[in-house]
Amino acid sequence: MLQEDKRELSESYFSKERLAEHHFRSYNAFLEHGMQDVVTEKERIETDIGDKEDEEPVWVELGDVRAVTPRVREADGSEELLYPQEARLRNITYSAPVFMEMSIVRGGEEEEERVLDTTETKVGRMPIMVGSDKCNISGFSDEELIEIGEDPADPGGYFIINGSERVLMTSEDLAPNKILAEYDSKYGDEIQVAKTFSQRRGYRALVLVERNREGLLEVSFPSVSGSISFVTLVRALGLESDEEIVHRVSEDPEIVKFMLENLEEADVQTQEEAIEDLGQRVASGQGKNYQLKRANYVIDRYLLPHLHEDGVEEEETRINKAYYLCRMAEACFELALGRREADDKDHYANKRLKVSGDLMKDLFRTALNKLARDVKYQLERANMRNRELTVNTVVRSDVLTERLEHPIATGNWVGGRSGVSQLVDRTDFMGVLSHLRRLRSPLSRSQPHFEARDLHATQWGRICPSETPEGPNCGLVKNFAQAMELSQDVDDERDLKQELSSMGVEGIPGISMETTSTTSADD
């Protein structure tokens, strides 16, 4: 390659659009389909209207949502286009109105459903990233940018809240929905643990399968105090026979021996007994019917939520959860037998990065839930006073706006995280570029965390080895390497599943016991 070609290539690669491209791509994806995904998840807002006798239920159905370009309402009531420089000088927020289709529906089991009011109403304002597709200066030439007071070399990728420039820090976290096996210590003994951070629709649950010092497996997950016997939980999920449980864990003779020890110690033999046992744990002292109801709710809601799929029957989902727990049990046993090494938490294959679009999606989800609670309250109040129920009277747009702007202004994010949003470092031009490409670890800087702070071989070409601060943040706050590419929109696994299916790969539930035994005999 000629010297001129190399220069041209490097200049085009390190242009201002490329330096903050990971922020733009993530945020644009959030505006295009991320917001709509959150609204589709919510689907409808239920109310308490209809609880009394002779009263028809009322609910709100949510439709399409869209954000327009940033505007400002002047004192005379007129709306004008807002540019970033004007927002900086006037100390206002660079945000755009968000419109959502909402329908108020009334109807009961006997009565036909009637739509009382349908309209696209303004539900709040969304802070817009400077330089994103919805930004008013997107696509402007250098001359046009200079004309409106913008710096043509400014990379964008930040928000303007009350006149202050705020950048969202890329967050580094352990990969969700992935089994990680490791050693741990309990009561002075070394034990084997398989864990997974099960995540779905903003809810994250840590599920642990531990092999205690007696060699028995125990499972811990949210909303259940202490741990539950592995065999009890798997039977509650629908795997009843000893043979089926052993087969789903492993066909290896040594692992089968471990599993037989667990089955001998089991207190329950049927699914009904297992659910009763679980009910006594999650609702002790309550009536039997309530205990059963609560036990079913807990295993459906809090145990491995990422295995829930829309349109899949509950029974099938439970069996899939049982198979997943069996895989976790196998990982524990393999670790105990020395067949596998403990997973490296610092390996970059076990890490995932949350960029601005992912962070905004989390924020929008909590803001929408707050808006839904407010709409429910306003509807019930209007109904109690016998007022006409219309969309515009029950939606207060400042509720959503406040929940979106305040965390970006302060840096205090949902889930108790702080320092997610920071003031853009304007010390010099390189400081801005560095700040836009910075990422932070959720680990506490007051703890040693020597291994997490160390350079890892898998960071080669992804993370800059030298750009990290001195002092307590050393190794926890890092920066992207210059030629780093961040893959995005990889959460949707449907295409991957279709591709694997076309290659003849069978899912775990489709593999029968006869198939496995035949295969092992042929080997």
Curated annotation (Swiss-Prot):
UniProt xrefs under InterPro entries: DNA-dir_RNA_pol_su2, RNA_pol_bsu_protrusion, RNA_pol_Rpb2_2, RNA_pol_Rpb2_2_sf, RNA_pol_Rpb2_3
Subunit architecture: Part of the RNA polymerase complex.
Organism this protein belongs to: Halobacterium salinarum (strain ATCC 29341 / DSM 671 / R1)
Record keywords, A-Z: Cytoplasm, DNA-binding, DNA-directed RNA polymerase, Nucleotidyltransferase, Transcription, Transferase
One GO cellular component term noted in the UniProt record for this chain: DNA-directed RNA polymerase complex
Major site of localization recorded for this protein: cytoplasm
One annotated GO biological process: DNA-templated transcription
EC numbers on record: 2.7.7.6
Entry's Gene Ontology molecular function annotations: DNA binding; DNA-directed RNA polymerase activity; ribonucleoside binding
Family annotation (Gene3D superfamilies): 3.90.1100.10, RNA polymerase Rpb2, domain 2
Subcellular location: Cytoplasm
UniProt protein name: DNA-directed RNA polymerase subunit Rpo2N
